[in-house]
Structure formats: C-alpha cells, structure tokens
Amino acid sequence: MLSDMYVIDGCAFAEEDFTGVTQKVKDSPLTAFFLTTPGEDQGMLALAHNIGGIYNMADDPASGLMVVRTIAELEEAKAQGKIGVILGFQNPHCIENSLEKLRALYELGIRVVQMTYNKANYIG
C-alpha cells in the first residue's frame, strides 16, 4: 500500500554542504523531500555553487537521490527506487530585488521559495 503512495517531507534543512541521506532514510518509504538549499543567505553565487554540488552528489548512483523539478521526474525517481530532492529555500534574500535572479534559480532547479523568514527581505 505504501508503494502506491507519495510520501514527501516538507522541510529538510542542511546548514552546510548537503552530503546526502542516511541509509535509514534510503530504507524508508520517503518519496521525496524539500531541501532547504545551503547558501541561501550568502548570495546568488554561493547558492548556485551549492546547487551544483547537490546535482553532482545526486549523479552518484550510490546516493539513492535524484533532483526532481517536475511531477514526471518525481514519478521517474520513484520508479527507479530513488528519493526525489526538491530544491528550495526559506529566505528569499538571494533573489534581492531581481526577477532575473528568480528566473535563473528556477532554471537551476529551485521549486520552493518561502516568501518571508526571520529577517526582512525585498519581498516581505
């Protein structure tokens, strides 16, 4: 029955470089998780660097992970027995006041943006 369901963790957080998940997580029924991408409060360059590192890590078959940007990719990850990683951030500071940066982050795979957080930003 769980194999037919989608189990998604709504907020996984990595303070430093994201290095993957434990074997216990790999063995769980988790389908995907929203990952708060490290570097979100350090500006666009740091965030892009960390996103690249997450893609590189997920490219390793031993990671058991796949960055997912669409429902089709989520279904593909599930079919392959991988856990989907949905990239996002909790603090939109790195967008500054630029729709161009938001578009660039979307192209890099960011799919979740929390509009406000603990500190004031350009959005709220």
Each PLM stretch: what is its role?
Residues M1-G124:
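N-terminal hydrophobic targeting/anchoring segments and the immediately downstream early-domain regions
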